[in-house]
Amino acid sequence: KEDMGSIEAPFKFDTKNSIKDLVIGYLPDAFKNGATKIDKSTLKAIKSLGAKVVKVQLEDLPYMSLINILYAEAAAAFEHLTLSGKDDTLTWQDDGAWPNTFRKARFLSAVDHVQLDRLRYLTMKSVAKLFKDIDVLIGPFDTGPGPMLVATNFTGHPCLHIRAGFEQLASRGAASLSDGKLNTGEAGEGKKFRVPHGISLWGNLFEEGKVLNVGMALEKKLNVWKERPSIDS
């Protein structure tokens, strides 16, 4: 009741529901540059589950700019760290670390905030339009291949991320919030480890059940849900 941005809504999910009457969409560009072999094989797998799978398009908007809202909200939530100087005690102090992100956010102008709120509204309309014709959207998690991770963080659409396979990668570098974008860390050189790679499923507002039903069917098809990285990974 104290959170004016939330809605009390029932959670509806029946594990026995079939997905054969559902429409699953995907953004073709998200499965091109930047997509992995696992991403592409997962798209192929979902086409074999009996549901209708269609290509869809998301309106062309500067979705990554929404990250600036995150900067401002985080800076406001942790303002006491910045004003007290306690942010200096945090271990990580690079450009992309949270302490410097809190500091940089204070240079966003009132005009910036108005424009970002307008962009957020356009994003809400764009994603709502997307889900008028589909029940679930499948796509890579990373922000490189597609915009859905960032876009739905500002619309509230539910997302399920499941293990889709494994790949051999060296340890990743630190995640970064510098340059006005989210970077989840790049794999470096050196010893490689067998690590899980996931795929994301998004659904319409208050329709988590459909997302979970598709996730269950996809997990069964991929048959990697029981596997774990080795202990030295």
List the predicted regions and their residue ranges:
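A short helix-breaking turn/cap at a secondary-structure junction
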Residues: 1-40, 220-233
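Acyltransferase
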Residues: 10, 33-59, 78-89, 113-134
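Short helix-loop capping/hinge segments that flank enzyme active sites or metal/cofactor-binding pockets
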Residues: 13-28, 68-125, 163-165, 171-199
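Short connector loops at secondary-structure junctions
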Residues: 51-69, 102
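Short glycine-rich anion-binding loops that position phosphate/pyrophosphate groups of nucleotides
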Residues: 143-144
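Short hydrophobic alpha-helices that are characteristic scaffold elements of the AMP-binding
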Residues: 152-154
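Short, well-ordered beta-strand elements
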Residues: 186-190, 195-207, 211-219, 224, ...
